[in-house]
C-alpha cells in the first residue's frame, strides 16, 4: 500500500497510532455508555460504524484521509471490541468468568491466525482496496446480525439468570473470597488503592510491549530470521492454552492466585530473555512467555470485576482502559530506545523485570485493600440491621 500510494512508512504508521489514541481517549465514555440500558443499541451502532469505516479505507488516497478514517475506526472499535465483550461476560457469568474471558481472547487469536493468510492472499491477488471492501462487507453481513439477534446486555433481558447465580442463591451466601465490593467509580477514585490498581494495570500493558521487540532481540542474539519467526510462533501457540489455564486459575483459586501465576510466568520469561544466547533459555523463554503474555488480555478485566465487583464494572473498566492503552503505546518505543542508547536489550529486560515486580505488588495491594473494604462494608450493614431491629 505504501509503495502504491507513495507514502513513507513512518507517515503511514501514524494510522494505527491515531486509531489507538482514539480508542484510549474514548474508553471512559464508552464505559459509561456500556453501563446503561441502551448498551445493546450502542453496540449495534458501533459495530456498523466500525464495518463502514473499514470499507471507507478503500477510497482513501492521501494520508489525511487515512488519518480521519483511522480516527473513526478507533472511535467505533472502542465500543465494539474489548470493553463491551468484557462487560457482557461480567454480566452473564457469576461462575467461570475467568475461563469464559480466556475463551473469548483465544477466539480472537484463532480468528487472527485463520484470517491473516486469507487477507494476505486477497491483497496479493485482488489488491488492498478490494480487500478493505471485502473485509468491511463481510464483517457487516456476519457480525451485525449476530449482535442484533444473539447479544443482550444482561440475562434479565432474556428472562434468565447469569450462569452461577442459582448456586449463589442455594448456598444462601457467597464465600468470602467471592463477595463483591460493588463500589462506584466516583467513590473509588477517591481511594489511593484505586490509583495503585490503575498503575498496576498500566504496567501490565507497558511491560507486555516486550512482544514487539522479542523477534529483534532473538536476531540480535545471533539467531537467524527463521529462528526468530519460529520462536514467535511457539509462544503465540502456547498462549492459546495459556489463556485457558490462566482463566481457570482465576476461577478455581481466586484473584490473588491468578495474579501470582500470570505475573510470575511473565517475570521468569523476561529473565530468560537476558540469557537467550544460550539456546535452552531461548526455548524456555518462549514457553514461559506463552503463559506470561496472557496477562495482557485476560488479567485486567478479570481482576477489575474481582476487586471492585460487577455492579459498576462497565464504568470502572471503561475508565481504567484509558491508561493501559497509553502504557502499551509507550512501552514498545521505550524498550527500543533503551536498545538504541546501550546497544543491547539487557538493560531494557532488567527494567521490565523490575517493573513486573512493582506491578505485582500494586495489584496484590489493591486486592488486599478491597477485601478489607468488603469486611468494613459488611460490618456497617450488620450494625444498621441490628439498629433497625
Predicted regions located by residue number:
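Helix-to-loop junctions at the C-terminal end of transmembrane segments
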Residues: 26-38, 243-254, 339-340
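Interfacial helix-cap and linker-helix signal at transmembrane-aqueous boundaries
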Residues: 1-2, 33-34, 114-126, 131, ...
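Extracytoplasmic gate region of multi-pass secondary transporters
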Residues: 1, 186-246
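A late C-terminal transmembrane helix in Major Facilitator Superfamily
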Residues: 112, 307-342
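Hydrophobic core of transmembrane alpha-helices in multi-pass small-molecule transporters
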Residues: 65-80, 202, 281-295
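Structural signature of the two symmetry-related core transmembrane helices
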Residues: 41-55, 257-271
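Intracellular juxtamembrane helix-capping segments at the cytosolic ends
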Residues: 79-93, 295-308
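Symmetry-related core transmembrane helices of the 12-TM Major Facilitator Superfamily/SLC fold
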Residues: 132-149, 349-366
Amino acid at each position: 500500500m505504501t509503495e502504491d500510494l507513495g507514502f513513507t512508512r513512518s507517515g503511514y504508521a501514524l494510522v494505527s497510532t491515531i486509531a489507538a489514541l482514539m480508542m484510549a481517549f474514548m474508553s471512559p465514555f464508552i464505559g459509561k455508555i456500556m453501563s446503561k440500558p441502551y448498551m445493546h443499541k450502542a453496540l449495534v451502532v458501533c459495530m456498523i460504524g466500525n464495518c463502514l469505516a473499514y470499507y471507507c479505507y478503500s477510497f482513501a488516497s492521501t494520508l489525511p484521509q487515512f488519518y480521519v478514517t483511522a480516527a473513526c475506526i478507533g472511535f467505533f472499535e472502542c465500543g465494539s471490541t474489548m470493553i463491551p465483550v468484557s462487560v457482557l461476560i461480567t454480566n452473564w457469568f457469576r461462575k467461570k468468568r475467568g475461563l469464559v474471558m480466556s475463551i473469548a481472547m483465544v477466539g480472537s487469536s484463532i480468528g487472527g491466525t485463520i484470517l491473516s493468510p486469507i487477507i494476505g492472499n486477497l491483497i496479493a491477488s485482488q489488491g488492498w482496496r478490494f480487500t478493505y471492501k471485502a473485509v468491511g462487507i463481510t464483517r457487516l453481513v456476519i457480525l451485525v446480525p449476530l449482535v442484533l439477534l444473539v447479544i443482550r446486555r444482561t440475562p434479565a433481558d432474556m428472562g434468565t439468570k447469569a450462569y452461577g447465580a442459582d448456586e449463589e442463591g442455594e448456598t444462601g451466601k457467597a464465600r468470602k473470597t467471592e463477595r463483591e465490593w460493588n463500589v462506584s467509580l466516583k467513590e473509588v477514585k477517591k481511594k489511593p488503592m484505586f490509583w495503585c490498581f490503575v498503575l498496576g494495570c498500566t504496567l501490565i500493558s507497558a511491560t507486555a510491549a516486550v512482544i514487539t521487540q522479542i523477534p529483534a532481540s532473538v536476531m540480535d542474539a545471533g539467531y537467524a530470521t527463521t529462528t526468530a519467526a519460529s520462536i514467535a510462533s511457539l509462544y503465540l501457540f502456547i498462549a492459546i492454552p495459556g489463556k485457558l489455564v490462566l482463566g481457570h486459575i482465576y476461577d478455581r483459586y481466586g484473584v490473588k492466585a491468578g495474579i501470582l501465576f500470570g505475573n510470575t510466568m511473565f517475570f521468569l520469561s523476561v529473565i530468560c530473555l537476558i540469557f537467550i544466547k544460550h539456546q535452552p533459555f531461548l526455548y524456555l523463554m518462549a514457553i514461559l512467555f506463552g503463559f506470561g503474555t496472557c496477562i495482557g488480555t485476560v488479567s485486567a478485566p478479570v481482576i477489575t470485576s474481582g476487586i471492585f465487583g460487577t455492579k459498576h464494572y462497565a464504568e470502572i473498566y471503561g475508565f481504567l482502559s484509558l491508561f493501559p492503552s497509553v502504557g502499551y503505546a509507550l512501552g514498545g518505543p521505550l524498550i527500543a530506545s533503551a536498545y538504541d542508547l546501550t546497544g543491547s536489550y539487557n538493560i531494557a529486560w532488567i527494567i521490565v523485570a523490575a517493573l513486573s515486580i512493582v506491578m505485582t505488588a500494586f495489584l496484590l495491594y489493591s486486592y488486599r485493600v478491597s477485601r478489607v473494604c468488603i469486611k468494613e462494608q459488611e460490618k456497617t450493614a450488620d450494625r444498621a440491621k441490628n439498629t433497625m431491629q
